[in-house]
Design a protein with these regions (language model features):
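Consensus positions within tandem repeat domains that build extended binding/scaffold surfaces
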Residues: 42, 50, 55-65, 71, ...
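Sec-dependent N-terminal signal peptides
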Residues: 4-14
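Sec/Tat signal peptide C-region and signal peptidase I cleavage site
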Residues: 16-20
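Terminal, low-structured helical/coil segments at or just beyond the last alpha-helical repeat
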Residues: 90-124
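Hydrophobic face of amphipathic alpha-helices that form TPR/SEL1-like repeat modules
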Residues: 22-29, 41, 45, 56-63, ...
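Short coil/turn and helix-start
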Residues: 31-35, 47-48, 61-69, 83, ...
């Protein structure tokens, strides 16, 4: 039993380390201005359910860093991040909605639902 607990703990630490390394790669790429690489890294983490990565993707789409500026996709990512507990994303989504039409918001909600149903694999 003790061996199992130690193995489980090592697995948890390894998985946690791998998770943070990928996130750090995204942040490092962003800080270097390599936005397309940051998006690749954060999309990978978002597909695993990372609210922070989802929020970062929302920001990228909102400002058009490395992607074409797109309020609908920004809202989608902020909504997904907020649904996963990111309070900053919730605020960003509310602020963004002030500059969106009802049709855009509706489309963003449809996309977010589709993304969630797909297990975060069909999100763009």
């Amino acid at each position: 039993m003790k061996f199992f607990l130690i193995a489980a703990h090592i697995f948890f630490l390894t998985a946690q380390n791998a998770f943070s390394q990928n996130f750090d790669k995204g942040f490092a790429a962003y800080m270097l201005g390599n936005y397309s690489q940051a998006i690749i890294e954060w999309r990978h983490k978002a597909s695993s359910g990372s609210a922070t990565a989802m929020s970062n993707l929302g920001n990228m789409y909102e400002v058009g860093a490395g992607v074409e500026q797109d309020k609908v996709l920004a809202h989608q990512w902020y909504n997904l991040a907020a649904s996963n507990g990111d309070v900053v994303a919730r605020k960003n989504k509310q602020d963004l909605e002030e500059n969106m039409t009802m049709s855009q918001i509706s489309n963003a909600l449809i996309l977010a639902k589709k993304c969630m149903i797909s297990g975060y694999s069909d999100c763009d």
